[in-house]
């Protein structure tokens, strides 16, 4: 069931049939709906990119070692789940990029979207290549540029949730989820984005493993 759910995400996104709270979305004007859709695409792309950035390494390691459950049956369930999570996220991300490209009507805007999406795809390729060939490879040089840029946009530098008490952190998380849900954004994207952002604010980029 989990595998089917992950692999169907791109199809559901194509037809815009995600579960969402659309009360305010329905009441919005055409221009308002355009902006709400734009925000949903951007938030979804960022969240899925960060998820894939870490999960693809876990999936590769799991496949290479043929990770198994360690039970009496000793099935390769962990390997299957990690692989399907990454594959499903990649197809989901691809469809969101296509939707964002189609969202614009001007050629300049479409070219900007293609450029940004190209940078994201290049980063994912570099992560895979560096993991397989090492930091000394050609892709390692490119990856170091991404890492250098990433050090300047670490959410933990602006909001360090470890310094907050659990009550305040919980209220912030719930408030952010409610605000995003009210925009009509798919609930799966909301929970993923808030989870990723919370992990970054708690532990930095190392928290993506969680």
Task: List each language-model region with its residue ranges.
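Alpha-helical transmembrane segments of multi-pass membrane transport proteins
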Residues: 117-210
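Alpha-helical transmembrane segments and membrane-interface helix-loop junctions
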Residues: 1-139, 207-210
């Amino acid at each position: 069931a989990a595998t089917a759910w992950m692999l169907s995400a791109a199809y559901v996104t194509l037809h815009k049939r995600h579960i969402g709270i659309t009360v305010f979305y329905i009441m919005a004007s055409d221009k308002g709906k355009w902006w709400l859709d734009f925000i949903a695409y951007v938030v979804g792309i960022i969240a899925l990119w960060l998820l894939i950035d870490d999960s693809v390494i876990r999936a590769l390691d799991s496949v290479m070692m043929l990770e198994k459950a360690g039970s009496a049956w000793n099935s390769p369930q962990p390997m299957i789940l990690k692989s399907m999570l990454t594959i499903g996220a990649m197809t989901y991300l691809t469809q969101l990029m296509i939707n964002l490209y189609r969202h614009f009507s001007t050629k300049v805007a479409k070219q900007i979207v293609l450029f940004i999406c190209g940078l994201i795809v290049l980063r994912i390729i570099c992560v895979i290549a560096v993991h397989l060939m090492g930091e000394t490879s050609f892709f390692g040089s490119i990856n170091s540029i991404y890492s250098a840029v990433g050090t300047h946009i670490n959410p933990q530098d602006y909001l360090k949730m470890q310094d907050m008490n659990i009550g305040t952190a919980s209220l912030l998380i719930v408030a952010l989820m409610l605000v995003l849900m009210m925009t009509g954004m798919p609930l799966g994207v909301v929970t993923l984005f808030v989870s990723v952002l919370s992990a970054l604010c708690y532990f930095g980029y190392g928290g993506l493993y969680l």
